[in-house]
């Protein structure tokens, strides 16, 4: 069964006031079976724009992720952040299809993964397809694995583009290197003028720093 993901993007105006939300939500997350994949690590917005804080949280299914958002526990925590932040909050279904073919010598795995979080509005679907075909090689070369590519989604707060893609890499360095590689940049040229993209590269969550 495909996983489900919370992807909130936030701008926090009052960190001290926001902390009460964090404390309550984090305590509940420790009991609800979800897994925090990314929050608070190194990050680089490589295309478009993103809010200042970005979170990637995994649930066992899309339905569970939606139910968690509407749960009594989160409904009590949620209002605590509203006066102190602006948020675009997306819940999206995970991907369970074929993955890029891995290279013979992919990048070494690091203790913390790296992720791409991309939000896309495709303006020319037919001419966008060559980009999809061309990105498979660099994704395989750098050990990428799709977590999200299409699937059901719900925008719970704010706004978001029509498509979301999340890729997991063996490390933050591998995620950045893939984007900057000649092979990926050659693929990216193929989508220029065919899509509007906001793309973030973010380091996996490090529990030792939180």
What are the language-model segments listed below?
Residues 188-190, 205-206:
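Terminal low-complexity interaction tails
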Residues 73-79, 183-189:
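A common structural junction motif
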Residues 1-56, 60-70, 74, 83-84, ...:
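Short S/T/G/P-rich N-terminal loop/turn motif that feeds into the first structured element of a domain
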Residues 28, 80-81, 190-191:
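Broad structural signal for hydrophobic residues in well-ordered alpha-helices, predominantly aliphatic
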């Amino acid at each position: 069964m495909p996983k489900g993901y919370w992807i909130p993007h936030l701008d926090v105006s009052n960190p001290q006031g926001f902390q009460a939300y964090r404390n309550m939500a984090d305590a509940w997350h420790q009991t609800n079976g979800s897994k925090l994949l990314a929050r608070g690590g190194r990050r680089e917005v490589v295309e478009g724009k993103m809010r200042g804080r970005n979170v990637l949280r995994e649930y066992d299914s899309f339905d569970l992720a939606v139910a968690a958002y509407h749960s009594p526990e989160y409904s009590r925590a949620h209002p605590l952040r509203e006066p102190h932040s602006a948020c675009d909050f997306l819940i999206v279904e995970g991907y369970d299809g074929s993955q890029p073919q891995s290279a013979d010598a992919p990048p070494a795995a690091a203790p913390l993964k790296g992720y791409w979080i991309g939000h896309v509005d495709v303006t020319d679907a037919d001419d966008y397809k060559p980009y999809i075909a061309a990105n498979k090689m660099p994704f395989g070369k750098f050990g990428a694995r799709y977590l999200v590519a299409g699937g059901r989604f719900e925008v719970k707060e704010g706004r978001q583009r029509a498509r979301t893609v999340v890729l997991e890499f063996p490390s933050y360095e591998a995620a950045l290197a893939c984007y900057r590689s000649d092979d990926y940049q050659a693929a990216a040229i193929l989508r220029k003028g065919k899509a509007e993209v906001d793309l973030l590269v973010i380091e996996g969550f490090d529990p030792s720093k939180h």
